Amino acid sequence: MEQPNSELLRKALRQFSTGVVIVTTINDHGEPIGLTANSFNSVSLTPPLVLWSLNKKSKSLNAFQATKYFAISVLSSEQMNLAARFAAPIENRFEGVEFNHSSSGMPLFDNCSSWFECTSSSQYDGGDHIIFVGQVISCGCSDSIPLLYARGAYGIPAPHPEVA
């Protein structure tokens, strides 16, 4: 069987709806680092593990590979501009953006749908990405509507008409 070309694969993957997160850490100069991702997923409840992946060409890769901690902010539907900002090639994504710090000092955003503070547990080679697994050391959630991403666009969840 032939492998699909990257354009077809990308189009097929865009059919899968995901949540939108900003993953953050602190670099070795004490500066906050963050990026938008939709590769976030749960791995295990016992122990509590989550994963996300990062392109090997990312300027943030070294900081995430070297860190002991990272945080994940699951964005709410009100945070589409924040998602776009942290996905853009901006030099200082945190400039003018309000955020708090987790107990380990990782940047976290207010008004998220949920958040996870993690210790960096494992890293795996995943083709053109590195897969990061984190052990959740604290988390929280709100009642806000989560931001979704599908077909190359942001969206919000809506009940299916048959169950609404």
Predicted features, each with a name:
Residues 1-164:
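Basic, polyanion-binding surface patches
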